[in-house]
Amino acid sequence: MQYIEMTGKTLLKLIDLTGLSQEELRKAGVRDDSLVRVTRLGDLELRKPHKWDAIGGLLGEFDHKLRHETGLDWA
């Protein structure tokens, strides 16, 4: 599986892609310094001490905007 990883701060800047509000992401545990990853299918996962937790997903045509905004490619 390929991912793009980013901080919670970056994810919160891309809020229009998530279909979730900042409040919902914060309730899920996303903080500015959180480690978050997105799968190619658009699944959002938050890094916890011993695992990754699914917290939602991205909507629409997120691929180009995600790569452009993060400066990263799928790895």
Annotate each predicted stretch with a short phrase.
Residues L17-H68:
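Acidic, low-complexity, intrinsically disordered interaction modules
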